[in-house]
Amino acid sequence: MSKNLSIIGAGAWGSALAIALYDNFDTIYLHAHTQDEVKILKPKYSALYPNNIKITCDFSKLQNSKDILIVTPSYAFSEVLEKIKPLISSAHQIAWGTKGFDTTKRCFLYESFERIFPNRNGCVISGPSFAFEVATNKPTALVVASVDKNTRKHFAKLIQTTTIRAYTNADIIGVEIGGSIKNILAIAAGIAAGLGYGINTQAALITRGLAEMSRLGVSLGAKNSTFVGLSGLGDLVLTCSDDLSRNRRFGKELAFNHSIKSALYNIGSTVEGLNTLELILSIANKKQVEMPICEQVYQVTQGKITPTEVVNYLMSREQTNE
């Protein structure tokens, strides 16, 4: 078999990875969701990458690749795994670049993977990475996490390029938590930015948000050290600091007193932080972990408090040790 890669998900992140990785493979099969998407994308890729990137919506093409990378929205993750399961052989290896929780099954993505593929080692690729910068070859560092050493080393080698530096980590729980909670905290950062607060406020939100992320992660068995790495602090700083982040832009829309519906319309794409909010807080409640920033973001999205009241509440909480 030639050295091919199948990427399932032709959105911004899947497309960026295809462009960034095309020199590493003979052929990359970029799987769109529908034939209409194929018709839109095919002329563009045929002109720029005529021999390397093939646009398709035919899952039978998975037979041409040993390695599969899933880059779909988190809500579609389980559905995609179920669809491809009959086509997967022992020769295939699967990783995903999706961040967030499986909200349809109310669990981590790796748990959905283990449920559908019980005898395989899951692998997640995460870290601070705006799709546009990856696609335009800006130097980027990613983390590849799996409980299996060979699996994480395999995918780290596959995605390493002159502009992508891949690190490995055994803590798949911590990496997935970081990639999920940072989206919620970015909404909070967007609210603060939209209200006109300064860098001091942003720094406080990032630092205290990291504490919330770490507390929940450790309660679920993750390593504290993971949260000061690329998938924790790295992705959190990125997502909270720049308007390339959809979640941050969504928070700014809320600060401008736009409704959830109009804010989502203005963003024009998935806001993962909004999708995972309720589930994260449900888990935190069961583990008796305090997450005041995430809780206040949830209250805003439910229309129970205003964006201004979020900051007022957080600043007036009872004093505690750091």
From Swiss-Prot:
According to its UniProt record, in which pathway does this protein act?
Membrane lipid metabolism; glycerophospholipid metabolism
Highest taxon of the lineage: Bacteria
Q: Where in the cell is it found?
A: Cytoplasm
Give me any GO biological process, just one: glycerol-3-phosphate biosynthetic process
Q: What is its main location?
A: cytoplasm
Q: Which residues are responsible for catalysis?
A: K182 (proton acceptor)
What name appears for this protein in its UniProt entry? Glycerol-3-phosphate dehydrogenase [NAD(P)+]
Q: Can you name the source organism?
A: Ruthia magnifica subsp. Calyptogena magnifica
Q: Which gene encodes it?
A: gpsA
